[in-house]
Amino acid sequence: MACRYPFSPAKVAITRFFYPSPLSRSTTPLFCPPSCRIRVGNTSRMLTSSSSVASEDPKSEMAKFLASPNPKSSASEPGPSPHDVLSAPTSAGHISEAEETLSDQLRNPGSSSSSSPSQSSTNNLSSKNAPFKLSSTYSLPSNISVPPEVREHLIEWSKNVLEHSRYVIQEAQKKFVGLGLKVNEMTGYQEVERLKYMVFEKEDELQRLREHARTAKAAYDEAVAARSEAQRETNILLERKHSWTDADVSKFTSLVRSDHTSSHAVASTSIALKDAEIAVDKSFSQLMQVILQRYHEEQVWSDKIRSVSTWANVAGLAINFIIFVGAVLLVEPWKRKRLVEKLEERVASMMERVDHRLEGVEGHLERVAAGSASASAIKEQHSDAAIQGVEDMPSNSTANPLEFVSPQTIPLMAAVDPTINGSESQSDPFFTQTIRGFPNYLDPLVKPSQKRDLAVAGMAGAVAAWILIGAVRLVRA
């Protein structure tokens, strides 16, 4: 089918991508308007998107045409022009109907609930056959009493909202149409539209010439039949020429006159038939030429759109390449420089903290060295005193040597030699039982010590972890 509605350019551009075949006339474009001209064979008629128009006005010509059983009878009527399109129901009509409905509901809030079930069923049945209408967004319940001032304000507000929405819709439609015209002008689609309308005109002209040729053919056939009938009757009279009467003579004269007239009619109708056939052939050739021109222009337009999209892709790739190069040459060095600066700042702060700590460690080492020197001196003094004491008291040789050391010198000596106070610094082991019967190289594991406690705790943890892993695997299985 071929739609004769002047599409907006944006819809035409989108339809072009969905229907790439330029000569395809068996499909309707994606954004076909509610009113289209449909061609089926040699007939041309106007249809609407729904039967609501015919149901609303059954006496209109459109309703009669749709109700007629033989639509081919209207094929001889001249088709409308490309701009003579049926006016489809617009949104403005629906908005006005919605406005009236809302006003009635606000004025009569209890009317909707006081209707009987039979009336509601009748309304439901009639609403199925009625055309689509915008219903009001809100209906007031019957148990709510609205003051007259509030009701008037609501009615005024609803009217203002509907008028504003109607104005916005109209302005949006105008802007879309203007945008489509600009797109058509920029892309050169106006020439394609002109050729499309020319194709429709040539089709109408070809249809008219074919009707004229059929009429000429019928007249030629009638003239030939009349001449044949006159010749047949003349031959019959000539066969009984010897028995003619006065009536036969007058009849023969009229037959000769009619034969002469029919011969002239046959000659004239044959010439008219030939002219009509030549005109039909010429119109058909012109139609094919216009179709080829339209196909060529559509191909040129498609190539132009394709080239524009190609250059757009190239421009996008170039922009992406520029961004990539800029990121590699400018952004990444700047990020690296900033990262290095931050790293240097952090390293400098860390080095400052390390320097402070090293200064503290050096002071501590100096104090430890001084303490160790004093401890060694005290140890030598006490060792000399101990040797003299041993010589004086040989019976006390088994005594502890630390007994001869004063309590004030023990911390200084422990700082130099940790083994002096090692028994006091270590905690008691958890397992105090000694295992016997093992060789000497297993003494760390046989005798009670912290190392044995740590080894036992590690083995117990390993066994518990192995048991837990096995349980988890069993649960998953």
Curated annotation (Swiss-Prot):
Transmembrane regions listed in the UniProt entry: 311-331, 455-475
This protein's record includes keyword DNA damage: no
Positions in the Mitochondrial matrix compartment: 476-477
Membrane side Mitochondrial intermembrane: residue ranges: 332-454
GO cellular component: mitochondrial inner membrane
Amino acid composition bias (Polar residues), ranges on this chain: 45-54
Membrane topology: Multi-pass membrane protein
Region (Disordered) residue spans: 45-128
Subcellular compartments: Mitochondrion inner membrane
One Pfam family in the UniProt entry: She9_MDM33
Major localization listed first in the record, in broad terms: mitochondrion
Keyword field: Coiled coil, Membrane, Mitochondrion, Mitochondrion inner membrane, Transit peptide, Transmembrane, Transmembrane helix
GO BP annotations, alphabetical order: inner mitochondrial membrane organization
Compositionally biased residues, Low complexity: 111-128
Coiled-coil ranges per UniProt: 190-233
This protein's record includes keyword Coiled coil: yes
Job description of the protein: Required for the maintenance of the structure of the mitochondrial inner membrane. Involved in mitochondrial morphology. Causes growth arrest when highly overexpressed.
Family statement drawn from the similarity comment of this UniProt entry: Belongs to the SHE9 family.
Subunit structure comment from the entry: Homooligomer.
Stated name of the protein: Sensitive to high expression protein 9 homolog, mitochondrial
Organism: Cryptococcus neoformans var. neoformans serotype D (strain JEC21 / ATCC MYA-565) (Filobasidiella neoformans)
Highest classification ranks of the organism: Eukaryota, Fungi, Dikarya, Basidiomycota, Agaricomycotina
Annotated gene: SHE9
